[in-house]
Amino acid sequence: MTQHVTAARPAAIRTRPGWRVWNLAALTALTAYSTGVAWQAQFVSYPLYRAMSAAEFPGYHLAYNAAIPGVVIIPGFLSFLACAAFPFARPAGASRTAAVVVAVTGIGSLLSTVLWAIPMHDRLDAIGQDPATIASLLGANAVRTACLTLATLALSWCTVRLIGRGQVSS
């Protein structure tokens, strides 16, 4: 009787999701959110920079920058950094290749933001509306959007595979 109970326990433990599975689920949701924000910026927010008058642009850009920390900056940087660390936190059933893809896209998103997009925003603050700077900002965001999209696809694929294997049931 004792052996039967002991033998049944490991099977029950194996089917219970651990922190790595919950981390995957949370990272997938966070990265999907950041991906949506990036697509919105690419096709709505940043193109509207061109539609403003030069006189109205500085005030608008300052207001935009003040409005985005909680909905864009914090989730974005959390996503970039968590993606970069994903190979160290991936669940056992998640592909190593997918984990590397997620990490590379996290690093790519971080670098395109810090080394390219932020300097373009700073330049817009300094010189005002400038078509070349807006075009460069769109380029930086295109890289970030592509990286985030690829990360979301890879994370979603990992999640679907784990669900298909029954490794996410509680």
What are these regions (language model features)?
Residues 38-42, 84-94, 114-121, 156-166:
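Transmembrane helix-loop junctions and nearby membrane-interface residues
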Residues 107-115:
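Mid-bilayer segments of alpha-helical transmembrane spans in multi-pass integral membrane proteins
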Residues 128-157:
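Alpha-helical transmembrane segments of multi-pass integral membrane proteins
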